[in-house]
């Protein structure tokens, strides 16, 4: 993982054929994190574009409205869909030496949810209700979303990874967060 060798105060994520569609995205997120040092990360809404379909574009996040905090419960119950990867900007220092539960999940092939959990536990995540990136689905038959739709074994592995991650996560939790993780 690139975090230990990356330079700079923050990192922003983008994968594959997704793209940023707002020229002010990075500056807005840097400005937020600079003026709110208590937050670990800042995310925003994303547009879902289904390639090869007449289906209209739609927002990735529909359960949240307005700028708000993304808490631990939202991250856990969202199963990695509390925000889209292309929307993330976070403090690099938090990923220099991430906890074991991150590596456990990563070994199962996913890293978005454990990273979001870590940020939620270390200052929180701010959601900006403004679409600033585009997530293209079904544009690559080998994409994560296509594989989950087509392959039961991939889904089974995801669930196994989720359970293993939760086991490793428990030492970091207290109070109601323990119950949320168990649910």
Question: Language-model features: where?
Answer:
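Short aromatic/hydrophobic "clamp" motif used to bind/position activated sugar donors
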Residues: 11
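Glycine-rich, basic loop-to-helix element that forms the pyrophosphate-binding segment
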Residues: 1-7, 28
